[in-house]
């Protein structure tokens, strides 16, 4: 028969003490109570011990104060008198105890009450109730008291000094089988809680008991260090675009209005250029522009928008408001030879908008811009590319609707369908207007689209407040 | 993006058919008009539309209904607006600050509550979209029966005339209006040199003082039947187009008739409005090439007519007639978009183009991603802060004095006005935000910083940096040195170290990283004053390194 080490320990107590039975409380000096109960349950299952439960009525002490009548006697003794008027008891006892005292004095006959006075013959009277309280302190089991004593205990209960309760007395006894078992020696191995090098190389583990664990007990969670969730989205998008044959490009964060707006055919008096939307720089505030390109752009603006173009506006420095500036800079940098080839490029970077900060808006956020330039690309191809891109991002249902951007025509916005949310706008796109491409000498069509990452991040991570992305709460960064 | 609220009942009246909410939500986006919502107000159903800024002709219920009747095919082609002659004249003097004015009449309009509301809203929206908040274009709409032609447009001085402005019962001079009237206060910046444009009638009564305010005399009410429209501005084209948008919208109303006004300046006469359509030429080959479609000329023409244009097929070319209220059609590409809209964006099959190009990552970005892997391997969490910060965090709390940074003119908030040139301070701020979280905390950030560079075309330069910090019960120089050297080793950078006196660090426990004699970074134990400035209570070590 295989026994747990604690089972052996418990049986050894019976063996060493040469006894067949113990009360539970007697065993508690050898082993914690909870362990005794658990182990004896195991041994009971193996028919080596049996347990016997007896419910015993016990007397519980509730109040350990002097009786109020004794307080009166002590008061009189201190003052070397033997009587007191009832009306003066309020100086000795609280109001609620006075009646109790008077009742007790009459019942016990320890003093005479005559003409409004209490007269003690003997201030050192013997009190049966007091004696019984003392006895209860030594033995709380109700059955050990005589019938006469039980009556007095009832009085004590009424007076609020004691109460009745029940206590289970558990006795653990060896069965016949158990008695036979302990006739043989019981060997207890050493217990191991932590495997160490010494234990391993010495071979102690061969004779030792390695304590088992509860495999379901919760342990402290560990989180890997990780990149920011925004970085994970950026990586995912880059992977898709690389697979689609796109090359990554970069451009300045501080831009002139020339590259950010003028080159993109946005009129200089367009509302988007007002203070409300764009971060203008206090210092520095003016940049350099390629002069030959400037004159071409000016000519296009004045011809189409029919207004007076201001070159000083073009030189103003701002924080770029979109990544389209990257695309247009790239196209402008192409040599004549390079213009003959197809191009697919993308830029993922931060852009800035002067918007009040709230749960939906931040003054800066990540945007991705992509363009495709080739001889015969068209609007239908643009829709094809966007469907492919969005499908790869995990959006199955995609639809398109007309939109407006100053630098593209036709223009569209793409929406994706989300279960429980409906259709959600996700990106804007179009074909660069001829007026955008004319100054840089490009005659092929150029498809273009841009997507903001804030919305992607909110969808992907279930955020309801965009500010959470940059709050950098480490608990969130660990779990997300 | 401007929005307008339209009463559903008014829209149905103008379209001349009942409209289900679902139909509205489905069809208007197809023509490029977003339905922001449909809701009830005072027991009446309201539709909120978002209008693209290139379609000011959609800024009214009348214009929307006209477009909608076309897109769903119940009334297509160019809308013909008859212009009746009148003997009304406007004499224009030289008004330097707002030299252009156009004027017209629309008579017979039944101005019920819907129409009155629509007029007021259209005026307000056009002030922004066409008028750049009245600077470029300002509009006056008047009860024509309250004044007597001919009319005069001239300049007066600040106390050169008196009249009761709209929404007032007190006669004021122009200067007093700028000081006391709500609109005067708001638009005072548009008046220069005490010269006030003014429009008067033959009896010397004031119609309006552009671009500030109309006179109370000609206030439009539901009793008005004949409307006089004035448009003034700094841009002739914008002034004329704005007038066209307004008169054609009003002519959509029952019984509304446009009447011409003769505008005379320097003995030269111009008749307004000029609703002559523009003409453009394109080909079906061009349209199909742009769209990737295979449409016949006849089909293309039908689609254009749904967009309320007209077109003819002549000599293998498509001649397109564009209504005078459109401001968004410059060339062939715009015609292609009209065809695509009428065809239906979601009918395009979406053919993926087969174009042979090679995907490639930016080399510096690749390096940054490699660094991310190293730092995560070291057990650091990546954080991403905003680039816009403030001098308290970037300099003061770091015990740094620096005046050479890029600042925005009008920040979104006081905390976001300086473009960062260093990342380390933002990591200290991140530690502050997490000061009640479990230790140790190890965080890093890789990102762009911007420094001033007078030699660059944008007078600035982007510098890519990485910074990292550790806060722990016990941490010191040795720990951060091991991490920094581990990073430099993985990056195969040949470096030297030397003592560095950086005010944010403890003196004698800070080192600079030199490469080819140039400082590319630094690391060490953060100064306890900096630690307490960021409300922290444990030792902090950190580093910053330029990436190139």
Curated annotation (Swiss-Prot), chain A:
Subcellular location: Cytoplasm
Keyword Cytoplasm: yes
Residues bound to Mg(2+): 409
UniProt keyword ATP-binding present: yes
Requisite cofactors: Mg(2+)
Disulfides per UniProt: none
Co-factor binding comment: Binds 2 magnesium ions per tetramer.
PROSITE patterns associated with the record: AA_TRNA_LIGASE_II
Top-level EC class: ligase
Domain of life: Archaea
Keywords: Aminoacyl-tRNA synthetase, ATP-binding, Cytoplasm, Ligase, Magnesium, Metal-binding, Nucleotide-binding, Protein biosynthesis
Gene Ontology MF annotations: ATP binding; magnesium ion binding; phenylalanine-tRNA ligase activity; tRNA binding
Annotated positions binding L-phenylalanine: 324, 407, 432
Enzyme Commission code: 6.1.1.20
InterPro entries in the cross-refs: aa-tRNA-synth_II (IPR006195), aa-tRNA-synth_II/BPL/LPL (IPR045864), Phe-tRNA-synth_IIc_asu (IPR004529), Phe_tRNA_ligase_alpha_bac/arc (IPR022917), Phenylalanyl-tRNA_Synthase (IPR002319)
Subunit structure: Tetramer of two alpha and two beta subunits.
PANTHER family per UniProt: PHENYLALANINE--TRNA LIGASE ALPHA SUBUNIT, PHENYLALANYL-TRNA SYNTHETASE
Official protein name in the record: Phenylalanine--tRNA ligase alpha subunit
Organism of origin: Methanocaldococcus jannaschii (strain ATCC 43067 / DSM 2661 / JAL-1 / JCM 10045 / NBRC 100440) (Methanococcus jannaschii)
Lineage of origin: Archaea, Methanobacteriati, Methanobacteriota, Methanomada group, Methanococci
Curated annotation (Swiss-Prot), chain B:
Compartment(s) where it occurs, according to its Swiss-Prot or TrEMBL record: Cytoplasm
Residues the entry annotates as binding Mg(2+): 328, 334, 337-338
Protein's UniProt keywords contain Nucleus: no
Pfam families (UniProt xref): B3_4, B5, PhetRS_B1, tRNA_synthFbeta
Reactions catalysed, as given in the entry: tRNA(Phe) + L-phenylalanine + ATP = L-phenylalanyl-tRNA(Phe) + AMP + diphosphate + H(+)
EC number of this enzyme: 6.1.1.20
Enzyme class of the recorded protein, top EC level: ligase
Transmembrane domains' residue ranges: none
Matches recorded under HAMAP family: Phe_tRNA_synth_beta2
Quaternary state and interactors: Tetramer of two alpha and two beta subunits.
PANTHER family, per the entry: PHENYLALANINE--TRNA LIGASE BETA SUBUNIT (PTHR10947:SF0), PHENYLALANYL-TRNA SYNTHETASE BETA CHAIN AND LEUCINE-RICH REPEAT-CONTAINING PROTEIN 47 (PTHR10947)
Protein's name according to its UniProt entry: Phenylalanine--tRNA ligase beta subunit
Organism for this UniProt entry: Methanocaldococcus jannaschii (strain ATCC 43067 / DSM 2661 / JAL-1 / JCM 10045 / NBRC 100440)
Lineage of the organism: Archaea, Methanobacteriati, Methanobacteriota, Methanomada group, Methanococci
UniProt gene name: pheT
């Amino acid at each position: 028969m295989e026994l747990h080490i604690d089972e052996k320990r418990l049986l050894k107590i019976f063996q060493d003490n040469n006894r067949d039975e113990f009360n539970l409380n007697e065993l508690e000096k050898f082993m914690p109570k909870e362990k005794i109960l658990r182990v004896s349950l195991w041994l009971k299952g193996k028919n080596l011990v049996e347990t016997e439960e007896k419910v015993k009525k016990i007397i519980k002490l509730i109040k350990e104060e002097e009786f109020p009548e004794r307080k009166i006697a002590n008061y009189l003794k201190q003052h070397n008198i033997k009587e007191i008027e009832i009306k003066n008891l309020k100086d000795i006892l609280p109001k609620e105890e006075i009646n109790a005292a008077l009742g007790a004095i009459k019942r016990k006959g320890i003093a005479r009450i005559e003409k409004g006075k209490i007269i003690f013959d003997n201030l050192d009277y013997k009190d049966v109730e007091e004696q019984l309280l003392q006895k209860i302190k030594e033995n709380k089991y109700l059955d050990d008291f005589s019938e006469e004593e039980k009556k007095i205990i009832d009085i004590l209960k009424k007076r609020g000094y004691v109460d009745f309760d029940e206590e289970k007395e558990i006795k653990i006894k060896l069965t016949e089988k158990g008695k036979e078992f302990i006739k043989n020696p019981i060997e207890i191995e050493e217990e191991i809680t932590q495997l160490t090098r010494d234990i391993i190389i010495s071979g102690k583990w061969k004779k030792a008991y390695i304590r088992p664990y509860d495999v379901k007990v919760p342990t402290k969670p560990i989180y890997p260090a990780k990149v920011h969730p925004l970085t994970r989205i950026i990586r995912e998008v880059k992977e898709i675009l690389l697979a689609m044959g796109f090359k990554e490009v970069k451009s300045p964060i501080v831009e002139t209005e020339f590259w950010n707006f003028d080159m993109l055919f946005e009129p200089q008096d367009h509302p988007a250029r007002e203070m409300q939307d764009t971060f203008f720089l206090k210092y520095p505030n003016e940049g350099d522009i390629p002069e030959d390109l400037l004159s071409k752009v000016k000519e296009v603006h004045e011809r189409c928008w029919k207004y007076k173009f201001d070159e000083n506006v073009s030189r103003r420095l701002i924080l770029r408001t979109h990544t389209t500036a990257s695309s247009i800079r790239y196209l402008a940098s192409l040599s004549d030879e390079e213009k003959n080839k197809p191009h697919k490029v993308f830029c993922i970077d931060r852009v800035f908008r002067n918007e009040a900060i709230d749960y939906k808006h931040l003054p800066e956020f990540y945007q991705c811009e992509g363009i495709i330039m080739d001889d015969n690309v068209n609007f239908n191809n643009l829709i094809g590319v966007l469907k492919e891109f969005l499908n790869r991002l995990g959006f199955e249902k995609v639809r398109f609707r007309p939109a407006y951007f100053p630098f593209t025509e036709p223009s569209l916005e793409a929406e994706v369908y989300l279960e429980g949310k409906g259709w959600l706008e996700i990106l804007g796109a179009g074909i660069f207007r001829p007026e955008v491409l004319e100054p840089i000498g490009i005659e092929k069509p150029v498809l273009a689209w841009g997507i903001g990452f804030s919305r992607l991040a909110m969808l992907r991570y279930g955020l309801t407040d965009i500010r959470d992305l940059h709050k950098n709460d480490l608990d969130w960064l660990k779990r997300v | 993006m401007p929005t307008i609220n339209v009463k559903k009942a008014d829209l149905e009246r103008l379209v001349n058919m009942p409209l289900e909410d679902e139909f509205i939500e489905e069809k208007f986006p197809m023509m490029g008009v977003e339905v922001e919502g449909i809701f009830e107000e005072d027991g009446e159903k309201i539709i909120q539309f978002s209008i693209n800024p290139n379609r000011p002709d959609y800024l009214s219920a009348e214009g929307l209904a006209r477009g909608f009747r076309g897109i769903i095919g119940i009334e297509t082609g160019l809308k013909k607006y008859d212009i009746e002659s009148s003997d009304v004249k406007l004499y224009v003097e030289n008004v330097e600050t707002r030299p252009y004015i156009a004027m017209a009449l629309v008579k017979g309009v039944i101005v019920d509550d819907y129409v009155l509301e629509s007029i007021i809203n259209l005026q307000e929206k056009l002030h922004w979209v066409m008028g750049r908040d009245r600077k470029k274009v300002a509009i006056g709409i008047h009860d024509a029966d309250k004044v007597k032609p001919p009319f005069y447009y001239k300049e007066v001085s600040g106390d050169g005339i008196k009249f009761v402005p709209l929404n007032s019962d007190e006669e004021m001079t122009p200067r007093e209006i700028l000081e006391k009237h709500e609109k005067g206060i708001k638009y005072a910046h548009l008046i220069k040199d005490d010269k006030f444009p003014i429009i008067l009638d033959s009896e010397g009564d004031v119609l309006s003082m552009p671009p500030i305010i109309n006179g109370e005399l000609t206030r439009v009410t539901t009793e008005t039947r004949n409307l006089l429209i004035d448009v003034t501005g700094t841009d002739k084209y914008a002034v004329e187009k704005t007038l066209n948008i307004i008169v054609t919208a009003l002519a959509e109303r029952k019984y509304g008739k446009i009447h011409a006004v003769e505008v005379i300046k320097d003995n030269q006469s111009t008749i307004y409005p000029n609703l002559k359509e523009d003409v453009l030429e394109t080909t079906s080959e061009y349209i199909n090439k742009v769209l990737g479609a295979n449409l016949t000329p006849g089909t293309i023409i039908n689609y254009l007519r749904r967009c309320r244009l007209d077109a003819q097929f002549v000599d293998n070319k498509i001649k397109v007639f564009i209504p005078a209220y459109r401001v968004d059609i410059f060339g062939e590409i715009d015609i292609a978009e009209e065809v695509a809209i009428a065809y239906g964006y979601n009918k395009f099959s979406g053919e993926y183009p087969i174009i042979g190009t090679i995907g490639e990552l930016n080399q510096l970005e690749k390096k940054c991603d490699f660094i991310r892997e190293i730092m995560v391997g070291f057990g650091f969490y990546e954080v991403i802060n905003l680039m816009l910060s403030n001098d308290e965090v970037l300099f003061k709390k770091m015990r740094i004095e620096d005046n050479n940074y890029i600042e925005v003119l009008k920040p979104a908030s006081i905390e976001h006005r300086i473009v960062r040139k260093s990342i380390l301070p933002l990591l200290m701020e991140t530690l502050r935000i997490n000061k009640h979280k479990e230790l140790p905390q190890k965080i890093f950030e890789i990102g762009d910083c911007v420094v001033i560079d007078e030699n660059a075309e944008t007078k600035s330069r982007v510098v890519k940096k990485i910074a990292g910090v550790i806060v722990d019960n016990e941490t010191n120089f040795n720990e951060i040195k091991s991490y920094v050297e581990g990073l430099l080793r993985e990056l195969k950078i040949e470096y030297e170290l030397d003592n560095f006196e950086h005010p944010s660090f403890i003196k004698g426990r800070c080192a600079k990283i030199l490469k080819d004699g140039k400082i590319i970074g630094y690391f060490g134990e953060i100064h306890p004053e900096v630690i307490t400035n960021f409300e922290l209570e444990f030792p902090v070590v950190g580093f910053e390194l330029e990436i190139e």
